[in-house]
Design a protein with these regions (language model features):
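Conserved SAM-binding loop
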Residues: 1
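S-adenosyl-L-methionine
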Residues: 4-42
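A conserved structural/catalytic subdomain of Rossmann-like adenosyl-cofactor enzymes
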Residues: 42-221
């Protein structure tokens, strides 16, 4: 893994030790994942989990080096300078194995904003890389009350469609925060595995229909 914030980086390493994972069994690097990735020699990966910072600034736009970076070039555009969200998604997709799965926590604006971000969503949908969008409850993560989403990526899907799950009501209130219980998690996972329509909760949408909706990936659409 890789983390740019030194405090979070050190906490991550401490967490490994607390779970009895020896130093030689993990490789967590300190640095900028987008402009200075540290694991070129290790990719591709069969499992990727990421909770990147929401809508941070980066070089982006028309940077001549990044636009030719093999992680970002397939979409034909770069994520905007003011919003790096989809750059993290393209990075994860690039380093994902053909038989792998990636899950990235996303700021909701990623799902509907226009411009370059719409073009990147179009690339992801037209190439059938998005497996599922899961709408999470608000007030779930530390530091933000915004209702985030999870985008699940796969490169070897059997059908040309995308599953949408509205899990915004799947939580219990704990003091001032919301929390997913094991029962909530099981409900979401069962819908994810079954890939069937469930009224007011899950819907499997053909990618052609998503294209007709201007590549808007909002679960409430």
């Amino acid at each position: 893994g890789q983390e740019i914030n030194i405090t979070t980086y050190n906490l991550c390493r401490i967490n490994m030790f607390l779970h009895d994972i020896d130093y030689d069994k993990f490789d967590i690097a300190l640095g900028d994942t987008l402009t200075d990735p540290q694991h070129w020699d290790d990719e591709p990966f069969e499992a990727i989990v990421s909770n990147p910072p929401y809508s941070i600034k980066w070089k982006g736009d028309n940077d001549p080096i990044l636009i030719n970076d093999p992680r970002f070039s397939p979409a034909g555009v770069l994520a905007p300078k003011s919003k790096a969200d989809l750059a993290f998604i393209m990075h994860s997709l690039s380093w994902l194995a053909t038989n792998g799965t990636a899950a990235i926590v996303c700021f909701p604006g990623v799902m509907y904003r226009g411009g370059a971000e719409k073009k990147i969503r179009q690339y992801l949908i037209d190439n059938n890389y998005i497996d599922c969008i899961i709408q999470l409850p608000d007030n779930l993560f530390y530091g933000t009350s915004i209702a985030t989403c999870i985008m699940v990526l796969k490169k070897s899907k059997s059908e040309n469609s995308t599953l949408f799950i509205d899990a915004s009501k799947e939580f219990v209130k704990v003091t001032n925060n919301n929390k997913l219980t094991q029962e909530n998690i099981e409900t979401i996972l069962n819908a994810f595995k079954d890939r069937k329509d469930i009224e007011h909760f899950a819907r499997l949408v053909p990618n052609s229909e998503i294209a007709e909706q201007d590549y808007n990936l909002s679960v409430s659409t």
